[in-house]
A protein has these predicted regions:
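Conserved metal-phosphate-binding beta-hairpin within the catalytic cores
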Residues: 208-229
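ATP-binding N-terminal substructure of ATP-dependent carboxylate-amine bond-forming enzymes
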Residues: 1-53, 57-63, 82-85
Length: 229
């Protein structure tokens, strides 16, 4: 049997669909967590974006954080919420779904007991929840990368979140204008000290290799007076 996709015609006759490569433009879910990539691997079809392993690491916040920490790259400590979890950090804390993105399901809480209660009751956290210290004075910084024909980095962008909102929410990203995230307010290029810009670019290049980034991707950072993560 030859791999690939087939179209079923009259009398059940199968005709192979010729596919040179698939441009993956999925946002979230099976299209971004490695499931679709695994299907293409099994079918012997080339595709854009990360491999199955790279996609899985990128969608799993706990795995990604552990990979960065093991490599010595600055990353805010992240913890899986369990009934017996204990933390030295004081609140506020930020609770996130272990899997997924776009700030969906993210909430700020005052303490660990509240985080645990939220993890056990919030439907968006049923597949796992993680918690880390919330930095109310940090700013968001993004950089895009391209790995072909060679690794290259974009200008650094600073998304501008509303002052009254504690997090850069899904609504801030996608519902602020008619063009979705393209309409979201931003500072581009971000005005940063030269040493911070250099540090961010170095870290982004390291993340590309560690997280098996392939094709085009965006890497997000937080920065305040204490450091860059």
């Amino acid at each position: 049997e030859q791999g690939g996709f087939y179209r079923s015609g009259k009398r059940g006759k199968l005709t192979q669909i010729e596919i040179s490569a698939v441009v993956v433009c999925c946002h979230g879910g099976p299209g971004e967590d490695g499931s679709l990539q695994a299907l293409f691997d099994l079918a012997g079809i080339r595709y854009t974006g990360p491999s199955q392993a790279g996609a899985a690491v990128g969608m799993d916040k706990l795995a990604f954080s552990g990979t960065m920490e093991a490599a010595g790259i600055s990353s805010l400590p992240l913890h899986l919420i369990t009934t017996d979890l204990e933390l030295d950090e004081q609140g506020p804390l930020i609770v996130k779904p272990r899997f997924g993105g776009s700030s969906i399901g993210i909430e700020i809480v005052d303490d660990l007991p509240t985080a645990k209660a939220l993890a056990s009751s919030q439907p968006l956290l049923r597949n796992g929840a993680v918690v880390q210290r919330y930095l109310d004075d940090a700013i968001d910084l993004n950089i895009s990368v391209r790995t072909y024909p060679e690794k290259s980095l974009s200008a650094i962008e600073r998304p501008l979140r509303p002052e009254e909102d504690g997090i850069y929410s899904y609504a801030d990203k996608y519902l602020t204008g008619s063009q979705g995230m393209a309409s979201a307010p931003r500072e581009l290029p971000a005005e940063l000290p030269a040493d911070i810009e250099g540090q961010l670019r170095t870290m982004a290049s390291q993340v590309v290799d560690l997280a098996m980034v392939r094709s085009v991707a965006r890497i997000d950072f937080l920065w305040n007076s204490a450091g860059l993560w």
